[in-house]
């Protein structure tokens, strides 16, 4: 049985460390995060994560106003816009339009950002599914309420008939 010397294990571990370090945006002021542009920001998932965090802190009206500033002709601007609007209590139709627009631009999203984008997109899709389920539940509730009303009316009619028959 051969054992690997400890220094060989340590060397293997060191080889697995990433070559590039990423800037951390945890302390970046939310008021400035959207103004940061360039490849160093666009390819850094921590930048996008901080953007999501900052967008989540905005009031819905403020998020909508900020989103209007960003066009959606590049993946970066469309993603910023989508992130802002996702916190703005948008309608399912608006959410679907954002997802569709970003789907068109998603092949341009760099590999380091793609997993974060996919998680964000999955969350947006879940929000759409939730809205659809709520809609179905609402329709089912209305239909059930209508059926119950009909049954109550029938029950009352039958009771009235029973009372009439019993009196005779």
What spans do the regions from the language model cover?
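N-terminal globular core domains of eukaryotic regulatory proteins
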Residues: 1-125
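Long, leucine- and charge-enriched amphipathic alpha-helices
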Residues: 126-168
């Amino acid at each position: 049985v051969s054992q690997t010397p400890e220094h060989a294990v340590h060397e293997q571990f060191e080889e697995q460390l990433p070559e590039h370090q990423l800037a951390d945006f945890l302390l970046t002021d939310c008021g400035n995060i959207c103004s940061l542009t360039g490849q160093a920001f666009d390819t850094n998932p921590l930048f996008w994560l901080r953007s999501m965090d900052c967008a989540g802190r905005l009031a819905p009206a403020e998020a909508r106003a900020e989103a209007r500033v960003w066009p959606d002709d590049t993946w970066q601007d469309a993603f910023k816009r989508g992130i802002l609007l996702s916190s703005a209590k948008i309608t399912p139709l608006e959410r679907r339009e954002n997802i569709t627009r970003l789907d068109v631009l998603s092949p341009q999203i760099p590999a380091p950002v793609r997993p974060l984008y996919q998680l964000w997109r999955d969350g947006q899709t879940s929000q759409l599914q939730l809205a659809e389920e709520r809609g179905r539940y609402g329709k089912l509730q209305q239909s059930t309420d209508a059926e119950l009303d009909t049954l109550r009316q029938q029950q009352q009619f039958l009771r009235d008939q029973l009372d009439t028959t019993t009196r005779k």
